[in-house]
Structure formats: C-alpha cells, structure tokens
Curated annotation (Swiss-Prot):
Cell wall formation. It is an enzyme of class 6 (ligase). InterPro entries: Mur-like_cat_sf, Mur_ligase_C, Mur_ligase_C_dom_sf, Mur_ligase_cen, Mur_ligase_N, MurCDEF_pg_biosynth, UDP-N-AcMur_Ala_ligase_MurC. Signal peptide: none annotated. It comes from the Bacteria. It catalyses: UDP-N-acetyl-alpha-D-muramate + L-alanine + ATP = UDP-N-acetyl-alpha-D-muramoyl-L-alanine + ADP + phosphate + H(+). It comes from Flavobacterium psychrophilum (strain ATCC 49511 / DSM 21280 / CIP 103535 / JIP02/86). Pfam families: Mur_ligase (PF01225), Mur_ligase_C (PF02875), Mur_ligase_M (PF08245). NCBIfam families: murC (TIGR01082). It is found in: Cytoplasm. Its EC number is 6.3.2.8. GO terms for biological process: cell division; cell wall organization; peptidoglycan biosynthetic process; regulation of cell shape. This is UDP-N-acetylmuramate--L-alanine ligase.
Length: 448
C-alpha cells in the first residue's frame, strides 16, 4: 500500500493515545483527517482544535461525504467491537481498512525505524529516545503512547526519514514493524487473554527480535533470554551505568560502553527502572550516530511523560504523584521510586485495576505489590474492552492484600477520604479513567 496515493484518513477510535498520535501525523503531512470516538476527552478536544472533525455517535451519516472515495484509508483500534456499523460499512465496500499497527508497519518500512519493545517501559524509553534524536537535529518523527511533558504531545517532531515507535506486544502488533535498531525493556507475562501463557509471550518477543537483522543493533536488558547487546546497571552489561548517585533529586551516573566511558550524566526521573530506560535510549541513540554531548544535554532536559511518575504536588510536607502503572511489576517500580525519594514518609496508594482478565491472571502479584504501601484505597476494576468475569472484582482482590490499612472505595468517596488522610505522600495508580480524576484530586489536595 502506498500512502502517497491516500488523500483521506478516517479513524475509528481516534481518541486513543496511539491513534491520536497517528492522526496528528497524517494531519501534519497534509492528509484530510477525521474520525469517530465513543466519548469526548482532552485528546479529542485537542484534535478538534487542530482542525480534525470528530463525532461521538456510531453513525455513517456523520462521516464527511468526501471520505466515501477510493483513496481513503480507514484506521481502526482493537478496542472497537466487531458490531460497529461504521467499521462494517467500510469493510463491506472494500475500502483500505487497517489496524493502527499495520499502518505503523507501512510507515516504518519506508523510514529508518528505531523500535522500543517490552511489557513495561516502552513509552518512557521511546519518549527519551525521541527527545534525544529531535534535540540533536535528526529528521525524526516519534509516535509515543503518552503525552511527553517537553512537547505536551504524543508526537515528537515531523521528520520524514527517521521514526521512533513503541513496539506493542498486544495482539502481536509489533510483528508488523520493520526495525533497524530496537530494544527490549522487559518480557514479563501480560495479555494472557491473547497469548495463553508466558512461553507464547517470550516466543513472540523472540520473533520481534529476529526482525532486527544486525544483532549489534538490538539492545536487551541484561538477563533477558535474547541475543543482543546487553544493557544494565552495576553489572557486566556491555552498556553499563555505574557510580550512580542521587544529588538534589537527580540521578548522576557514569556509563561504560564498548567504545567509550561517559562521565557524570544527569537524569531527572526517579526510580531505577527509569535509569535503565534512559540507558537503553542512550545506547540506541549512540548506535544511530548521535554525538555523546547531544545525548547528555537531552537526558538532562527530559521532563518525563504525563502519568508516568508524574508529580502533581511537590511541597516540602506533602507530595502527590500520579502513575499509569497497571501491572504488578510496574507497581513495584513505583513503590521502589517512592521509597527511594521518601524513605520515612507515610505513603497512601490509590489503585484502579485495569481489565478483569489481567486482575484475574495476576491477582496474587497485585496483592503483594499493593501490600508494600502504608495504606491502600482500591477502586472498582476498569473494564476497558472487556465484559465482567464472574467472581473477579476489586473486593476479591482486596481480600488477598496483606495490609490492615486497606479499603474498597467508590469514586465519589475518594477525594473526601484523601483530604482526611494523614499520609504525606499520595500516589494514584492505574491505566483506566482514574487519569481523568487527577485534575480534581490535585485541586482538592492542593488546599491541604
């Protein structure tokens, strides 16, 4: 398929974080762009402000008439049900209908692609990498699964020859990509509703890794069962961070690579997982040819990604952090980062589980990760694309949490409880609509 022959791009599910980045991209390169989504959001409002027509009812009559021509590309998200009338209309009339991952595949085939894979850390690592390349003057476009604070966008740059993409393992989407340089951050079990078991996930990551022809351009966290250049901290990795210290809330560290020693790099995101994310981005950028000085400057200026250990309130006696974590390993990483920064403070965690299947598959691990906090408030499960599973609910999960300071709460009870709390650090955690509550939570807690 030749994108140059496409004049119109219509999105079904345009408000998703990945879909909206693609919509911005196609608008930027001069295509006519419009779309449908189920509900209005901050992202859809921003797209409408940029000149993209969006409607919120599954109704063929609301699609602009000039999209009913053969040079229209229709892009769908996996979250859209098969009964969706707009989707079926385009399918039945044999329009070009593609998944988002397939379209990214078409784009990366025609560009130099740097792909970031892994069950955790994709968004932060690809954001750091996109920032490094953009700041160093590369002709790059980075498609990000989150809003990067430096740009207030999920799209970095407008380059035509280099792309940075998140290689998403969900539905084996990353196998559509054509990576020239790639990394794998982690290979923990997830999406068992798709894969069935851990072995199938690992096999899929290996298949992705095999798409990188030159294994000197595949970077893997030390210990993963993949052949590539190893990356780690204080170990025997080929790209290794050492002499790590914290000064005034910043990581300062040295890096030894196969060809050089880099001294006193400065990076502002807390947590050891973020340090290795930065190290992966450094290794990929250095291999791409970015000068060390440019990498160092960009690492120091990187502000982070919204909802990734995002400080909402940072006062001397009270802190509120918001994070997108939705897997036990990610919650552990949030906990580690909080304890590293605030070792003697009382930490309250609010968690909204995401997906019934994920809650069921990892219930014991979720319980262990949540039990580490001083106090836990648990919201109802956010279903996203799923129907309920009998017996799987937040009360069932809470029973497994070994902590006497735990409570099941409804959304309308949350803010009053937080205002009464004596916790000096509050963290909201989850990938569901808890993110839409953050503005109000911040507003109310700012008065504490």
């Amino acid at each position: 398929m030749n994108l140059n022959q496409i004049h119109n791009v219509y999105f079904i599910g345009i408000g998703g974080i990945g879909m909206s980045a693609l919509a911005r991209y196609f608008k930027f390169i001069g295509k006519n762009v419009s779309g449908y989504d189920k509900t209005p959001s901050i992202l859809t409002s921003e797209l409408i402000e940029s000149g993209i027509a969006i409607h919120f009812e599954d109704n063929i009559d609301l699609i602009p008439k000039d999209y009913f021509v053969e040079n229209t590309l229709v892009i769908i998200t996996p979250a859209v049900p098969k009964s969706h009338s707009e989707w079926n209309y385009f399918l039945e009339r044999e329009y070009h209908v593609k998944k988002r991952a397939e379209v990214l595949g078409i784009i990366t085939k025609d560009t130099f692609c740097l792909a970031v894979a892994g069950t955790h850390g994709k968004t932060t690592t690809s954001s750091i990498l996109g920032h490094i390349l953009y700041e160093s003057g590369a002709d790059v476009t980075a498609f990000i699964g989150g809003i990067v604070e430096n740009y207030n966008s999920n799209l970095i740059g407008s380059g035509k020859t280099v792309t940075v993409v998140e290689a998403d393992e969900f539905d084996r989407s990353f196998l559509h990509l054509y990576p020239n340089i790639a990394c794998v951050t982690s290979m923990d079990a997830d999406h068992l509703d798709i894969y069935g078991d851990d072995a199938a996930i690992k096999a899929s990551f290996k298949e992705f890794a095999d798409k990188v022809e030159d294994k000197n351009k595949l970077f893997v966290i030390n210990g993963l069962p993949l052949k590539g250049i190893t990356v780690g901290a204080n170990d025997d990795s080929q790209f290794v961070a050492h002499n790590i210290r914290i000064e005034n809330g910043w990581y300062i560290f040295d890096v030894k690579t196969p060809t050089e020693n880099i001294k006193d790099l400065k990076f502002g995101l807390p947590g050891k997982h973020n340090l290795t994310n930065a190290l992966l981005a450094l290794a990929m950028a250095r291999t791409f040819g970015t000068p060390t000085e440019s990498i160092a400057k960009a690492l120091a200026s990187f502000k982070g990604v919204k909802r990734r250990f995002s400080f909402q309130i940072r006062k001397p006696k009270f802190v509120y952090i918001d994070d997108y974590a939705h897997h036990p390993t990610e919650i552990n990483a949030v906990h580690q980062a909080v304890r590293e920064l605030y070792p003697n403070e009382k930490v309250l965690a609010v968690f909204q589980p995401h997906l019934f299947s994920r809650t069921k598959d990892f219930a014991n691990d979720f319980a262990k990760s949540l039990s580490q906090f001083d106090e836990i408030l648990l919201l109802d499960i956010y279903p996203a694309r799923e129907l309920p599973i009998e017996g799987i609910n937040s009360g069932w999960l809470l029973d497994k949490v070994e902590n006497k300071n735990k409570k099941l709460v409804h959304k309308n009870e949350l803010i009053p409880l937080l205002k009464k709390s004596d916790a000096t650090v509050i963290v909201t955690i989850g990938a569901g609509d808890i993110g839409e509550m953050v503005v109000n939570i911040k507003k109310e807690l700012d008065e504490k």
